[in-house]
């Protein structure tokens, strides 16, 4: 491992929920996923991860992991995204990741349209569009405490307060 890579690993160890040995295992997994050896994972490579491939929100996951919007996920972004799913990841970190799933334009709010689009990805054609829109409208109305027509992170946090988000967003077997 060169000095630059060693420095990157030290930084990742400080800023993620992973130990040095866990980061080494993640690096090996990342390199296996990076089929073309480009140093980053594109959408097709990302969808080879079993826990993500079967998720109806797989494309949202890619967008969240891809912090810089380059269309690919480098190792640091990979670690950053997975860190929220670590058993060492706290409630706030998991809530922030979940919020990002819905905040498609990254403006810090979940709009009616964003909530609709994400829920549509989750339910597919199991609900009629009109039924889904009614659920979205009711959710926004009930959770939107300041009446601005959208959900802030704080409002989102209150809305999901009764759920066990820590358990639901922890992947025991990341390696």
Curated annotation (Swiss-Prot):
<keyword id="KW-0106">Calcium</keyword>
<feature type="binding site">
    <location>
        <position position="105"/>
    </location>
    <ligand>
        <name>Ca(2+) 3</name>
    </ligand>
</feature>
<feature type="binding site">
    <location>
        <position position="45"/>
    </location>
    <ligand>
        <name>Ca(2+) 1</name>
    </ligand>
</feature>
<feature type="binding site">
    <location>
        <position position="70"/>
    </location>
    <ligand>
        <name>Ca(2+) 2</name>
    </ligand>
</feature>
<comment type="function">
    <text>Regulatory subunit of calcineurin, a calcium-dependent, calmodulin stimulated protein phosphatase. Confers calcium sensitivity. Plays a central role in virulence and antifungal drug action.</text>
</comment>
<dbReference type="GO" id="GO:0004723">
    <property type="term" value="F:calcium-dependent protein serine/threonine phosphatase activity"/>
</dbReference>
<feature type="domain" description="EF-hand 1">
    <location>
        <begin position="21"/>
        <end position="56"/>
    </location>
</feature>
<dbReference type="InterPro" id="IPR011992">
    <property type="entry name" value="EF-hand-dom_pair"/>
</dbReference>
<feature type="binding site">
    <location>
        <position position="146"/>
    </location>
    <ligand>
        <name>Ca(2+) 4</name>
    </ligand>
</feature>
<dbReference type="GO" id="GO:0008597">
    <property type="term" value="F:calcium-dependent protein serine/threonine phosphatase regulator activity"/>
</dbReference>
<dbReference type="InterPro" id="IPR018247">
    <property type="entry name" value="EF_Hand_1_Ca_BS"/>
</dbReference>
<feature type="binding site">
    <location>
        <position position="155"/>
    </location>
    <ligand>
        <name>Ca(2+) 4</name>
    </ligand>
</feature>
<feature type="domain" description="EF-hand 3">
    <location>
        <begin position="90"/>
        <end position="125"/>
    </location>
</feature>
<dbReference type="GO" id="GO:0005955">
    <property type="term" value="C:calcineurin complex"/>
</dbReference>
<protein>
    <recommendedName>
        <fullName>Calcineurin subunit B</fullName>
    </recommendedName>
</protein>
<feature type="binding site">
    <location>
        <position position="66"/>
    </location>
    <ligand>
        <name>Ca(2+) 2</name>
    </ligand>
</feature>
<feature type="binding site">
    <location>
        <position position="107"/>
    </location>
    <ligand>
        <name>Ca(2+) 3</name>
    </ligand>
</feature>
<dbReference type="GO" id="GO:0071444">
    <property type="term" value="P:cellular response to pheromone"/>
</dbReference>
<dbReference type="GO" id="GO:0097720">
    <property type="term" value="P:calcineurin-mediated signaling"/>
</dbReference>
<feature type="binding site">
    <location>
        <position position="72"/>
    </location>
    <ligand>
        <name>Ca(2+) 2</name>
    </ligand>
</feature>
<comment type="subunit">
    <text>Composed of a catalytic subunit (A) and a regulatory subunit (B).</text>
</comment>
<feature type="binding site">
    <location>
        <position position="148"/>
    </location>
    <ligand>
        <name>Ca(2+) 4</name>
    </ligand>
</feature>
<feature type="binding site">
    <location>
        <position position="38"/>
    </location>
    <ligand>
        <name>Ca(2+) 1</name>
    </ligand>
</feature>
<keyword id="KW-0479">Metal-binding</keyword>
<feature type="domain" description="EF-hand 2">
    <location>
        <begin position="60"/>
        <end position="88"/>
    </location>
</feature>
<feature type="binding site">
    <location>
        <position position="109"/>
    </location>
    <ligand>
        <name>Ca(2+) 3</name>
    </ligand>
</feature>
<dbReference type="GO" id="GO:0000747">
    <property type="term" value="P:conjugation with cellular fusion"/>
</dbReference>
<dbReference type="InterPro" id="IPR002048">
    <property type="entry name" value="EF_hand_dom"/>
</dbReference>
<feature type="domain" description="EF-hand 4">
    <location>
        <begin position="131"/>
        <end position="166"/>
    </location>
</feature>
<feature type="binding site">
    <location>
        <position position="68"/>
    </location>
    <ligand>
        <name>Ca(2+) 2</name>
    </ligand>
</feature>
<feature type="binding site">
    <location>
        <position position="103"/>
    </location>
    <ligand>
        <name>Ca(2+) 3</name>
    </ligand>
</feature>
<dbReference type="GO" id="GO:0019902">
    <property type="term" value="F:phosphatase binding"/>
</dbReference>
<keyword id="KW-0677">Repeat</keyword>
<dbReference type="Pfam" id="PF13499">
    <property type="entry name" value="EF-hand_7"/>
</dbReference>
<feature type="binding site">
    <location>
        <position position="36"/>
    </location>
    <ligand>
        <name>Ca(2+) 1</name>
    </ligand>
</feature>
<feature type="binding site">
    <location>
        <position position="34"/>
    </location>
    <ligand>
        <name>Ca(2+) 1</name>
    </ligand>
</feature>
<keyword id="KW-0843">Virulence</keyword>
<dbReference type="GO" id="GO:0005509">
    <property type="term" value="F:calcium ion binding"/>
</dbReference>
<feature type="binding site">
    <location>
        <position position="77"/>
    </location>
    <ligand>
        <name>Ca(2+) 2</name>
    </ligand>
</feature>
<feature type="binding site">
    <location>
        <position position="150"/>
    </location>
    <ligand>
        <name>Ca(2+) 4</name>
    </ligand>
</feature>
<feature type="binding site">
    <location>
        <position position="144"/>
    </location>
    <ligand>
        <name>Ca(2+) 4</name>
    </ligand>
</feature>
<dbReference type="GO" id="GO:0006873">
    <property type="term" value="P:intracellular monoatomic ion homeostasis"/>
</dbReference>
